[in-house]
């Protein structure tokens, strides 16, 4: 019996073999089962907790008739500018049906959204090129680790991919329909509304609607040389209805925009286009800020993480579909535009991007459709059995790598890198691995089981580099604290769970991480992605606390005890050096800083400390070199800019000093020390400019 979606999406011709339709249905059903079962081991993704908390606020806003406006108070997360309707709908269901296992249900809902996205992509391929292309679309998704990995727990980007793909599909069908009726207009309105309701970028679909309609009307005019005023009025009425209807429906579950229907949406788009939160991540072997990455960050990450079989299909599409382009050029042209335009736009805008290309998962379904059509055309082009067998064998070889990665490394599917980087092992230390913290779940569950076995009932403090309270919610004797891994010596903890996320590539490549006191290491393809660390001594924390409480002599005792042992934490040496420096022991300070650099030669605080000591001694040349090193490692280490600029001013390099300060103020316009020094640089040469900077400094906190 054919699935019910067929009557909605397409009408299969009588000539299509039942066995082909049956295979399509079977593959789609198997994918659904696989994806739903795959959520059982899914971790909580990096942004999931904060989005869930925001969805609870959205629920409370509507449950109180708008009286509870805490949903609008998001100074850090900025989530009031984010529609996140899928999160909101999921939380509504959680509340209505009193679901206790919140995150499991969220992951199941997300897997369903991911499967629907795959299904619609396959149906789009069927509409464009037949069942063969549709089946290949399903198969390509089955070996797409990045998409399948995010389909486990990414309730931001997977639902948006579903909405964007649905909007694209229904828009194309509406544009090329013989008659535009409610039957093809309503799905278009609903899909655009769904896309807008998730994030402001959904507005793209309305832009496509207007642009593609204008192109078709212009094409009709060129062919007929006539303008039908009545028809144009009807088209304008239909467009207005679609735009208004989809927009109004799209903001129903978005409190901020619902209260400010025009200005709220414009502000949301502005914030999301240049998202203010920036993070450091590994790219090409070095840590770099997300808003300072090279322009090719996005295309390169897509190139090295999308399976080569998909890229082979894309190349085949452009090489072999000339006839299809001649017959359906506009359809394919519009589809390709929906892929390329968002990518080109963010490259042009130099938008703030991080977390690999997960924010652009929404273009992947259309890429897979083109790849599937390309592979289908490749198989059709070469009908000779031996040649076709060779092609199939080649495709199976290309599919082998991503497929076996999925089998070996589930639930860490999204960590996949293709053969261009040498796989995950080749990417290790050069690109981020578990950037969405999926492995924290396995680490937490292992530690809970181990403590119940070996330390039942003990009150212990657990540290993590990602909020993990949910996994420990039933363990009343275990207190969980979040802190960055690099700051671990400054916190009180007994065990620490650390995902391989945003850790210095120097520590990774030199095998300083995972540390030697790890009691459990979780791996994917032979590389560590999470470590459970047991603290051997709290002398580092006690020494730090003593110094903070102004007891340097006591602090020294703790640190002396610690550094006698093998130590892999460079910050301990930095903190110990700070104590010695405060006590006037410069020689020991320098010695400790050097030992810290033996662990991590690129430790910015230590290099900065060394530079300050050299500047204090008057060795300005060496100090300047170290300041430049710090800036080279971290372009947002703002304290280094005025420090280096002062040396430049002393050495009469005023132009260089001002360039440094301008660079600093471009990234942080409110950095007062740089403003004051800029004023000083003009104090003699241009008192009026100096006065303006002085005024700016007074206005800056």
Per-range role (PLM):
Residues 3, 424-701:
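C-terminal luminal/periplasmic domains and tails of membrane-associated envelope-modifying transferases
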Residues 25-26, 121-143, 162, 180-183, ...:
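Transmembrane-helix signature of polytopic, membrane-embedded enzymes
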Residues 137-142, 149, 169, 192, ...:
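Short helix- or helix-capping micro-motifs
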Residues 300-328, 483:
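Hydrophobic, aromatic-rich transmembrane alpha-helices
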Residues 237-274, 303, 397-413:
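Membrane-lumen/periplasm interface segments of specific transmembrane helices
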Residues 5-7, 170-184, 192, 205-247, ...:
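Perimembrane helix-loop-helix junctions
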Residues 108-128, 166, 170:
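Transmembrane-helix motifs of polytopic, lipid-linked glycan transferases
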Residues 25-29, 190, 207-211, 239-244, ...:
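Signature aromatic-anchored transmembrane alpha helix within multi-pass, membrane-resident enzymes
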């Amino acid at each position: 019996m054919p699935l019910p979606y067929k009557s909605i999406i397409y009408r299969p011709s009588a000539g299509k073999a039942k066995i082909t339709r049956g295979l399509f249905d079977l593959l789609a059903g198997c994918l659904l089962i696989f994806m739903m079962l795959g959520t059982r081991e899914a971790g909580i993704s990096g942004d999931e907790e904060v989005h869930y908390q925001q969805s609870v606020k959205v629920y409370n806003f509507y449950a109180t008739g708008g009286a509870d406006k805490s949903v609008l108070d998001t100074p850090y997360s900025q989530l009031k500018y984010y529609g996140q309707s899928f999160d909101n709908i999921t939380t509504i269901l959680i509340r209505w049906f009193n679901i206790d296992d919140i995150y499991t249900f969220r992951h199941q809902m997300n897997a369903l959204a991911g499967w629907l996205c795959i299904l619609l992509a396959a149906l789009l391929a069927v509409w464009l090129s037949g069942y063969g292309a549709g089946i290949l679309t399903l198969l390509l998704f089955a070996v797409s680790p990045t998409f399948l990995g995010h389909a486990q727990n990414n309730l931001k980007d997977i639902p948006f991919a579903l909405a964007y793909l649905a909007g694209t599909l229904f828009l194309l069908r509406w544009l090329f329909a013989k008659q535009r009726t409610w039957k093809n207009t309503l799905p278009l309105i609903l899909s655009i509304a769904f896309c807008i309701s998730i994030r402001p970028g959904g507005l793209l679909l309305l832009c496509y609607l207007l642009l593609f309609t204008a192109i078709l009307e212009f094409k009709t005019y060129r062919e007929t040389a006539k303008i039908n005023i009545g028809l144009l009025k009807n088209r304008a009425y239909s467009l207005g209805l679609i735009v208004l209807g989809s927009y109004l429906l799209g903001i129903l579950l978005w409190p901020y925009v619902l209260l400010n229907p025009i200005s709220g949406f414009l502000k949301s788009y502005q914030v999301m286009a240049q998202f203010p939160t920036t993070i450091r991540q590994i790219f090409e072997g070095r840590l770099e800020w997300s808003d300072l990455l090279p322009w090719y960050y996005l295309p390169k990450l897509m190139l090295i993480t999308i399976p080569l079989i998909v890229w082979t299909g894309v190349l085949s599409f452009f090489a072999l579909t000339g006839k299809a382009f001649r017959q359906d050029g506009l359809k394919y042209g519009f589809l390709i535009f929906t892929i390329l335009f968002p990518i080109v736009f963010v490259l042009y805008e130099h938008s703030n991007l991080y977390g690999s290309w997960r924010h652009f998962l929404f273009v992947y379904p259309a890429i897979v459709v083109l790849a599937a059509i390309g592979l289908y055309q490749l198989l059709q082009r070469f009908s000779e059995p031996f040649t076709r067998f060779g092609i199939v064998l080649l495709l199976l070889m290309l599919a082998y790598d991503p497929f076996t990665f999925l089998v070996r490394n589930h639930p860490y599917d999204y960590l996949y890198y293709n053969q261009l980087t040498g796989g995950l092992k080749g990417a290790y230390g050069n690109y981020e691995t578990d950037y969405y913290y999926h492995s924290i779940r396995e680490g937490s569950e292992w530690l809970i089981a181990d403590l119940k076995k070996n330390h039942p009932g003990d009150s212990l403090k657990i540290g993590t580099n990602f909020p993990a309270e949910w996994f420990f919610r039933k363990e009343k004797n275990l207190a969980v604290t979040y802190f960055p891994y690099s700051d671990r010596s400054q916190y009180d903890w007994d065990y620490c769970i650390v995902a391989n996320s945003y850790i210095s590539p120097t520590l990774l490549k030199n095998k300083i991480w995972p540390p030697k006191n790890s009691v459990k290491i979780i791996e994917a393809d032979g590389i560590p992605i999470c470590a459970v660390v047991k603290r051997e001594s709290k002398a580092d924390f006690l020494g730090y606390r003593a110094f903070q409480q102004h007891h340097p002599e006591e602090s020294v005792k703790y640190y002396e005890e610690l550094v006698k042992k093998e130590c892999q934490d460079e910050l301990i040496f930095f903190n110990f050096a700070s104590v010695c420096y405060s006590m006037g022991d410069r020689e020991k300070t320098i010695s400790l800083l050097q030992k810290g650099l033996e662990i991590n030669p690129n430790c910015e605080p230590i290099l900065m400390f060394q530079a300050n000591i050299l500047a204090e001694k008057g060795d300005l040349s060496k100090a300047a070199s170290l300041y430049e090193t710090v800036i080279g490692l971290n372009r947002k280490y703002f304290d280094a800019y005025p420090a280096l600029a002062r040396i430049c001013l002393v050495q009469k390099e005023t132009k260089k000093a001002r360039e440094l300060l301008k660079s600093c103020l471009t990234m942080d316009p409110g950095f007062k020390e740089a403003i004051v020094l800029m004023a000083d640089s003009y104090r003699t040469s241009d008192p009026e400019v100096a006065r303006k900077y002085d005024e700016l400094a007074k206005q800056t906190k």
